[in-house]
Amino acid sequence: RRSSDLYSIPNTKKLTLSTTFRCAKNIVKHAQKYTPELKAMDNAIDGVVREGSVINEAENGDFVLCRTTMPLVKLFFHFLLKEKKAIIRGSEIGLSLIDMTTDVENIDNLKQIWEEKLNTYKLSLLANGVINPEEDSDYASLEDKVLTLLFIARLSKNIEDLRLKIQSIFSDEIEGIILSTVHKAKGLEADRVFIVRPDLLPMTKNIRSQWEKQQEINLTYVAITRARKELVYDNKWTDED
């Protein structure tokens, strides 16, 4: 059947590609700040966009999203102390962190090696004319991985214990409270979604080009539209010591 014939079928309504079947009306209204053409279904529920506490409110089936990994790791251990089941989505993130422990003898060596590598990369950026290396997106990505690895290392007895902890934290299973970077949440959805460290969305301090700026806007849109019914911003919780 030709596509033009489909609209002759009774009760068939033409929808634009920007119409979302997933999100409640208030969530769509919020997302329109970043994607103005987005529209909700006429029969969508109103839904809720509000502030709240991820530590006190998050339950099984909820998503918790962040622009970077490090805050999610700290949240994972918060939930562990509260005896709440949680995982960080992305087994390949865990494998990448485990790869960073290859040929390392002990935790002290691990810390020294990766702090030196991070500093060396910073110096190379300076040598190549980058005025503020901390605001370079590649540096920020490496720094996030190093800080994540070293945080888990501080809670580990030795390198083998560190690897086991990493394997238990990062998973592709969908169970408990699902902690995820926005990148890893693409294509997923939940009735309720928390966003932590909303100051990192969009991550404007690392922007060097218009293309990067647009990618950050796209990520912010992705984060918002993972929520079907309720979107909760936690503006108070922070991973900063």
Identify what each model region corresponds to:
Residues 1-241:
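The feature marks helicase ATPase cores and/or their adjacent C-terminal helical subdomains
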